Amino acid sequence: KEYRRQRQMCIRDRIRTRDLLGLDTQIVGVVSSAADAFARSLEAGQIVTTETADTFADGMACRIPQPEAFEIIRAGAARIVRVSDEEIARAMRIYHEDTHNTAEGAGAAGLAALYQERERQRGRRVGVILSGANIDRQQYARVLAEG
């Protein structure tokens, strides 16, 4: 529970930092399509809970958005992109093969979203944050073997 709360704070803190620095950087959130309570909440303009959050990217398995984080994200995020477990796994493999970095599912989600939006982002300066390598070795081996 604490880990998921910290994940919600991750985008919140980036929004706050951007605002404190007076930047106009667009910040895009990413959620698992199987755990999209935050995306649904932003679309509804109020907190929406989900019955399940069935994703292997456990750092994104949020069913109930934290109110403080929701308010900051609603006010400061450009949008939220939903990514599938398959897209997350692909991003994990890209990090492993191309940069020799280990990324957990939630940590690779930003790259998955960027890949999904590659045409929309073409020609733009984009930053992606890789965070977290907290993944079970057997699960990581399965993800790598799928590619």
Regions found by a protein language model. Give the residues of each.
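Single conserved hydrophobic/aromatic residue that forms the stacking wall/gate
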Residues: 1-11
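Glycine-rich beta-alpha junction loops
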Residues: 8, 31-36, 54-56, 64-66, ...
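Short Gly/Thr/Asp-enriched flexible loops that form oxyanion-binding sites at enzyme active sites
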Residues: 12-22
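Anionic-ligand binding region
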Residues: 17-18, 26, 37-60, 65
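Residues at the starts of beta-strands that form the adenosine-phosphate
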Residues: 24-26, 125
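Active-site-adjacent helical/loop segments in soluble small-molecule enzymes
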Residues: 66-123
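Phosphate-binding loop/pocket of nucleotide- and phosphate-handling active sites
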Residues: 109-147
